[in-house]
Amino acid sequence: MAIRFNLIGIAVADMGRSLAFYRRLGVDVPAEADSEPHVEAELGGGLRMAWDTDETIRSFDPDWKPAPGGGRLGLAFACDDPAEVDAVYAELTAAGYEGHMAPWDAFWGQRYAVVNDPDGNGVDLYAPLSGQPVGPGRGR
């Protein structure tokens, strides 16, 4: 058997608000998906991202409860350069999303910032400081 990682799933309280956030990060999700109870998007490289409303999850797991306080999932989005980290952070916070950590130059050689998605999950934005390429293993 060849098992492989294939999907990142996020439980959401408000599908439309969550999808609007991830669209701003470049995830290709059709506008008509905002009212759906389950949505999936291809990320490339054989990976998918999925969102399920709390109600959808309870439909097959009636005792399910969202984890209190969020922050149980970390996602990281690579930016082309440090200026893009700053710009994306500014765009998201100006749109009303909660900034958790404003952009800073991290000791590990990256420009880094963290914005919380609508359900309280930290979403990292990063880019190399030294001009090194962004790629596998270069995130947090």
Regions found by a protein language model. Give the residues of each.
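Active-site/ligand-binding-proximal alpha/beta "capping" segment
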Residues: 98-104
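A short glycine-rich beta-strand->turn/loop micro-motif centered on a GG-aromatic cluster
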Residues: 34-35, 102
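Glyoxalase I/VOC metalloenzyme domain signal
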Residues: 1-6, 11-33, 43-98, 116-140
